[in-house]
Amino acid sequence: MITSELFGTAPCGTPVHRYTLNGPEICVRIMDYGATVLGIDVPDIPGNVRDVVLGFDKLEDYFDNPACFGATIGPVANRTAGATITIDGTDWHMPANEGANNLHSDLEHGLHKRVWDVELDEVHNAVRMTTSLEDGELGLPGNRTFTAVFTVTRTGVFRIEHGCESDRATYVSMTNHTYFNLAGHNAGMDCEHFFVANAAHYLPINEQNIPTGEIAPVEGTPFDFRELRPVAPGMEADDPQIKQARGYDHCLCIDGYQYGRNLRRAMHVEEMWTGRELDYYTTAPGVQLYTGNWLGDEHAKDDANYGWGAGFALEAEMYPDTPHQPLFPQGIVGPGHPYSNVIEYHFMRH
């Protein structure tokens, strides 16, 4: 069953609605402003239900949301060197919003700043959201139609399906930017997360947090999560990559990528105090692991104060700066070649 209610009004004057999807041992709240995940309620071992998603109580706080809590990011997630992408011999320019580089397309006018059109699918317990960009809008070519479909399945799996169609060649790499704390969104560092990542390689970054182009083995580094290990020690490791980002803000190269055709488990997360667990699946080649290294919001939901490390984001996407790295899996889409990315969240308690 899907319920909807008025959540407020966007700066453009368009009404914003909040939608609730329920399933076995899960309740998901989303809104059409930014196709944003607002909250996910799941139980711990004794059955105590908590919201495990960081965010705000009020719509107005999402208008100034530099952390991009819960947002659908696009058309290009993550960082692009020089804020420029070359497509078919033409240079296309996005805003230089992080020094000379681009982060998340356009932090002021990106997809997370729009009110999306909505279609409810009661049969599949899904909310389908759609928005469009004209040719050249946000600095990239193509008349583009973007979709984000949010589904809670009969087995309690939360699925997000991203898609894009364009009438000319363009570059697309969408993701969802939800932050989690499996001990509860306001638990802060009073938690103990352990990770497993199906990733034998990661992408080192330079002093501007742009991938160097190397696809490096994780063995012997803080990025080796091939076996269950706590994330907190790695966030403060004496490692130049960790120091550069103040924690983890790196792309893990998920094993078994087959050009978006295979959904596979990328990450497994356990919170030891509550017994909540998360299996994270995707069809994307990489997952940006971000450990909230720059969080610091005093206006969060339930009067929470999210500081450094208060939550982690798993961002399934094309590798950062792919247009400048020919050895990376590429993300050019166009007529007859639509973009798609599937993300699934499987919550458990053990």
Regions found by a protein language model. Give the residues of each.
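An exposed, glycine/acidic-rich loop-and-rim segment of catalytic or binding clefts
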Residues: M1-H350
